[in-house]
Amino acid sequence: MSSEGGGKSAPQIPDGLIEELSVELQGEDAPFASSMERDLELKWSEEGESRLGFTRFECDHNEIYRRRRLGVPPGPVTIALNPILKDDTALFRHTLAHELLHAAGLLDHDDLHARIVSKVAPAPKLRDSPVLMRLREQVLEGLPEGQWICGKCGHTWERRRVTRPARCPKCASRFEAK
């Protein structure tokens, strides 16, 4: 595995993560798993990147599916992780496991992909993740309305969540926005 830092140290794969993923991938259709570490470059993405991580193969998607079908190694693979993950070990591990599965040949976000990631590196709870809390605050700040108003009783309360509440906390009627 190579890594280029450009002045900042490149991310490192936590001890045992590749081995845990390899165990879970036994018997599954993951044609690049055996060559995953050989041509893998791990780096930090650019500041301001909106994604937590991404996997990039050097060849186009048609060639990747052809190589997957033929069982041929994919060639050089780059996994870029968002630098904000430096502050959150659990989310870093979860995101890296997700991207390593793509590098192993699980290209789709299906049930198998989700099951393996949640078993090997479960996503942290919102309250346990400083990065997720920060991202949640950014989303809430960007919403046009800062409060909810019940259409039935007129009760007003501060908006702390992105999704619409099911019921008014005062009158308990089904929530209808005013």
Kindly give the residue locations of the regions a language model identified:
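Active-site recognition of the HExxH zinc-binding catalytic motif
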Residues: H94-L106
